[in-house]
């Protein structure tokens, strides 16, 4: 037995107490993430085991299973290989550490068995953007104009999938070429965007995004305006917002049981189908966001500008996520510099007379 517990609780009971208090501290989306991660871990560690019986050896065994074992995929998800990345496993273990530390802080456990366990070493996953040719094939493979418009807006703005689902015409000013991101769709409810920096951010639209939105305007701009409840970060608070959804299943649905707006799962399925029809290498739909960032960086956009567009607090996140990708694309940067700077270079003589 590891340490002396003041009150014997199963690991499930301890986790439930931890989550109950977290409910008032974090946004609903974050709470759902906590719950999902802890549920996965409990299925491995054994929810009926006493929390006080979990030792370092058991935790290392759990970590190994997370790293190498098969995971149960969500509905319609494609799992290409067993295990999880080191970054994901470290995130899971951090959540479990928080549960045990909660137990120590509140007198349920005498000590935290995580002492002496260091995070796994691992590199961040390198973004895997679409090439221009792949993107054209993807768009050509879309079966209706709305799908083409949706993926053009996604790739040329870099907004998150949930933000795309929750986008309303009230948020868009095509005359000034701007879009305000006010909300996100998480699970079955509307929330504020994932980060504080991403909330009410103004996205400056480039021409391909404007063209796609003008095309979509003919399909949905005059549709029904909805009054929706948006859950704020402060516990229990909501705000009513007007929203005429930009992308609507009704426009392209082949069946009648559609909702007023797309879900993250439904646009992911749309992506997977288009990727398969296009005959391009499979990627997750979130790579549409990475494609925007990578294309923008290659085009010479300021990382701080890209960070603002994508809802990051500062350019540091851009360097963290895309730094390795940027270093592996130095040739593109050299080409860009040659294009942009060569015209300003003075003409240099190359005859033998100058060599002295």
Short names for language-model regions:
Residues 121, 129, 185, 310-336:
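Catalytic-site neighborhood detector that most strongly recognizes the C-terminal catalytic loop/helix
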Residues 9-14, 50-51, 168:
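Short, structural beta-strand-to-alpha-helix junction motif
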Residues 176, 189, 194-211, 215-223, ...:
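C-terminal secondary-structure termini that scaffold catalytic or DNA-interacting sites
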Residues 13, 17, 36-40, 61, ...:
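Generic recognition of well-ordered alpha-helical segments
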Residues 72-75, 82-86, 90-92, 105, ...:
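Basic, Lys/Arg- and aromatic-enriched nucleic-acid-binding interface segment
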Residues 4-7, 19-102, 106-108, 124, ...:
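N-terminal core-binding DNA-recognition domain of tyrosine site-specific recombinases/integrases
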């Amino acid at each position: 037995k590891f340490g002396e517990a003041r009150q014997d609780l199963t690991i499930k009971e301890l986790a439930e107490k931890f989550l109950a208090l977290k409910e008032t501290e974090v946004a609903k989306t974050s709470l759902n993430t906590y719950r999902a991660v802890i549920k996965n871990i409990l299925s491995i560690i054994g929810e009926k085991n006493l929390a006080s019986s979990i030792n370092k050896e058991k935790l290392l065994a759990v970590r190994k299973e997370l790293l190498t074992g098969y995971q149960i995929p969500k509905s319609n998800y494609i799992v290409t290989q067993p295990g999880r990345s080191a970054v994901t496993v470290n995130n899971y273990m951090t959540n479990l550490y928080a549960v045990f530390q909660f137990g120590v802080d509140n007198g349920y456990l005498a000590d935290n068995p995580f002492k002496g366990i260091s995070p796994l070493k691992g590199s961040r996953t390198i973004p895997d953007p679409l090439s221009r040719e792949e993107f054209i094939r993807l768009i050509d493979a879309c079966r209706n104009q709305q799908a083409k418009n949706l993926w053009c807006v996604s790739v040329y703005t870099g907004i998150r999938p949930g933000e795309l689902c929750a986008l309303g015409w009230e948020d868009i000013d095509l005359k000034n070429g701007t879009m305000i991101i006010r909300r996100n769709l998480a699970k079955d409810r509307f929330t504020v965007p994932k980060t504080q920096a991403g909330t009410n951010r103004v996205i400056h639209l480039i021409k391909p995004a404007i063209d796609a939105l003008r095309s979509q305007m003919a399909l949905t701009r005059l549709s029904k305006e909805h009054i929706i409840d948006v859950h704020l970060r402060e516990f229990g608070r909501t705000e009513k917002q007007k929203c005429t959804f930009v992308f609507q299943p009704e426009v392209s649905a082949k069946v009648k049981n559609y909702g007023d707006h797309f879900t993250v799962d439904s646009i992911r399925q749309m992506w997977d189908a288009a990727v398969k029809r296009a005959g391009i290498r499979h990627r997750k739909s979130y790579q549409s966001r990475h494609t925007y960032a990578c294309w923008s960086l290659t085009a010479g956009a300021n990382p701080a500008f890209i960070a603002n567009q994508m809802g990051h607090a500062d350019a540091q996140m851009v360097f963290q996520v895309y730094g390795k990708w940027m270093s592996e694309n130095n040739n593109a940067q050299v080409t860009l510099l040659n294009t942009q700077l060569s015209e300003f270079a003075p003409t240099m003589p190359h005859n033998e007379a100058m060599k002295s």
